[in-house]
Amino acid sequence: MKKITFGTDGWRGLIADDFTYQNVGICGWSIASYIKESLINERGVIVGYDTRFGSKEFAIQISNIFLSVGIDTYLVTEPTPTPVITSEVISRGCDMGIIITASHNDWKWNGIKLRNSKGLSLDKEELNLIEKKSNARSKDEIIKLYSGKLKGLLTEISPKDGYLELIRSKLPISEIRKSDIKILNDNMYGTTLGYLESLLDDSNSSIIVDSINNYINPNFPDIIRPEPIEINL
């Protein structure tokens, strides 16, 4: 097994090479172990995922690990942007947010991004501790973990509407809707599908939103990677 190495926000790996069900399970157990040992509030976690290959399935796998050790888990019902998960962690007062995503990397990658109760990246010491746990676990220990009865409470959530309401409370949306502008919106086959349209939608609005790459495709065709840089726009 390749060594699991954490970067600034979490761990990323090549799908089917080192980012596998076995390694995701080991990493998930290590995160769960850290939460049980270090976070005394036990306020639950939120698990999200993006539109990449297997992201939803990996999110379900990690959720089951958390449940098996008694961690209440909120699992999103659709691919969700990381800032939305972060906002939901704060509003619900959860211990942590875990997102299955490789951010702007190309289609061959996936990853596990972590956010603390304040919506921030975990500090280096915390990540080092989880990394150390990840590389000390064996496959047999993970199998034993799945043999237990689920003990945590699973709640499925859809945080999109609440997040859009938060944005509306921060911006003069009614004035923006009167601006009579046309917006070209590139969703890059990702998690923002429908967000801008929903935010600005109103029968009296004069804004036109023209969206492209407005469907899920984990291959991210015609772009190098899902990142708003000049070569992709």
Predicted regions and their residues:
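Glycine-rich phosphate/diphosphate-binding loops that line cofactor/substrate pockets in enzymes
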Residues: G28-V45, I142-L145, P172-K178
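Short glycine-rich phosphate-binding loop at a beta-alpha junction
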Residues: I40-D50, K182-N185
